[in-house]
Regions:
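Extended catalytic cores of very large enzyme megasubunits
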Residues: 1-185
């Protein structure tokens, strides 16, 4: 069963004005950048974004604790999640933008792609001879969830790139237009 904040707790924030500040610019940036489109076609309001992020964070924590049999305490989790909600709602602290955008969405909840919470990553090309596609697969996978990827040039000149062979029949590869399809194409 997923972690959810109590309805009574959330109710007190539904009509509360968020302290965006900056003469409306803060709210404009929030609506443009972090407010996700809901199933009904409307954008999330701040209280809904905070709820999604907090519940997503606690779902991740609950899954980890239960997987390793560390003793989930539902009462303590509800209490600390409410404190986290209140602090985020009032902008006493904010998670990173990537967290506001992806935490608690299908990307993290269903697919388990927590890499989407990262801004950037790095991959080395040093061992290209061992696995030619590995750094490129990593780069594609991370890029497809919005992570910027840096790389080194240690693998430069470790193999020669030649043009296509023209003396054979061409083959057609159909790549599924999904994140997984494009990653697999590497």
């Amino acid at each position: 069963m997923d972690f959810t904040l109590s309805d009574n707790f959330i109710e007190q924030y539904r009509r509360k004005r968020a302290p965006f500040g900056f003469n409306g610019l803060g709210e404009l940036v929030y609506m443009r950048t972090y407010s996700r489109l809901k199933e009904d076609g409307k954008n999330e309001m701040w209280w809904e974004t905070v709820q999604r992020v907090v519940e997503g964070t606690y779902n991740m924590q609950k899954n980890h604790i239960e997987r390793y049999d560390l003793g989930w305490n539902a009462w303590q989790a509800q209490r600390s999640a409410q404190e986290m909600y209140e602090r985020i709602f009032n902008m006493k602290f904010l998670p990173p933008g990537r967290g506001l955008w992806s935490m608690g969405t299908a990307l993290t909840e269903e697919k388990g792609l927590y890499a989407a919470l990262n801004n950037c990553a790095f991959v080395s090309t040093q061992n290209l001879k061992d696995d030619l596609s590995k750094p490129f697969t990593f780069l594609m996978d991370a890029s497809m969830v919005g992570v910027g990827v840096g790389f080194d040039t240690k693998g430069a000149e470790s193999f020669v790139v030649r043009g296509p062979k023209t003396d054979r029949d061409s083959e057609l590869y159909i790549i599924p237009d999904t994140r997984e399809g494009w990653v697999e194409s590497m």
